[in-house]
Amino acid sequence: MAQLSDRLNRLAPSATLAMSQKSSEMKAQGIDVINMSVGEPDFNTPDNIKQAAKKAIDENYSRYSPVPGYPDLRKAIVAKLKNENGLEYTINEVIVGTGGKQCVCNAVLALVNPGDEVIIPAPYWVSYPQMVKLAGGTPVIVNAGFDQDFKMTAEQLENAITEKTKMLILCSPSNPTGSVYSKEELAALAEVLKKHPEVFVLADEIYEHINYIGKHHSIAQEPGMKEQVIIANGVSKAYAMTGWRIGFLAGPEWIIKGCNKLQGQYTSGTCSVSQKAAEAAYTLDQSAVEEMRVAFERRRNLIVKLAKEVPGLEVNMPQGAFYLFPKCNSYFGKSNGEKAINNSTDFAMYLLEEAHVATVGGDAFGDPDCFRMSYATSDENIVEAIKRIKEALGKLK
């Protein structure tokens, strides 16, 4: 009997996409579901960016694009990195990919050999360990729990590094927790990493502009770290362009050349019209980015306030992104008489079926005591969702 490859069978399906799909199916049945499982802004792409895309269509940007991306877009990314982050790159040190997800995977596949270890602080984005496994590497999970604001310490990093370590994947601001590493915390991690120049850092900075505690700081900005860091970023979150599928990597030229070789064999260049839209995003008026950030911060404050009023939840204070990651383990072992809650996946499914609110269990993110709620939705939806959750949890004994 024909079977899927062992490589594919090693991969787990995306829990976030699975919950979003389940939510969509219930909505199609006429059920009023509030979807707080999705990881994308609810805003529309700014008009000036859409106009640039329309102009690109009229100017017949409809052919294959260069594998690493149009030079003008890469120049815009280089300028962004210099002006916003104080980092000097050339266009040969930048590659554009089909969304941030492909870019992260490109970097992993370009550097990780079978048997190599990749350090991943938990909680983590669901796809990181799966990408490492796809490359034949071994994910080394470092638990950074609620009590340490979900951030790995320098001591934990030092203890996790072995002779097999190839990479650290670091996401700040974080999906799923919203935690942001401070400049001082990144400096401490950098001091450890500089003692191990063979270990690369894949810095996922896709939520860079959704930051509530000040200007973003990249670990690549730490003295002596730039050649050890590959930055992954893109337009999806900051510019509400998730469906345009444009991300980028910036790093040492030899690594970017490797990613170019890889990308050339399995996706080639990204959508030409999307690239022109992304170029506009980086070069035109940036006021919409700040307007969306302010709205997310207001929603953050609202959901934290309301969630703290729900008995049994221990609520974190996100410093960035648009996720809340509360502890829900006080409900484990409880039941509504029909269904028992044994773990965070059960907890999230109970909320979907009983409260009609879609969330994601923390098991998928490497922290079984918590669950993730996205507040990339309206204030009204946040208020109604927490009300439903509170009522549903009140039925558990």
Residue positions per predicted region:
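PLP-dependent class I/II
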Residues: 2-4, 8, 12-14, 19, ...
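Generic structural signal for well-ordered alpha-helical scaffold segments
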Residues: 24, 78, 82, 108-109
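A glycine-/small-polar-enriched, mobile loop at the entrance of the PLP active site in fold-type I
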Residues: 37-40, 55-73
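Conserved N-terminal alpha-helix of the aminotransferase class I/II PLP-enzyme fold
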Residues: 64-97
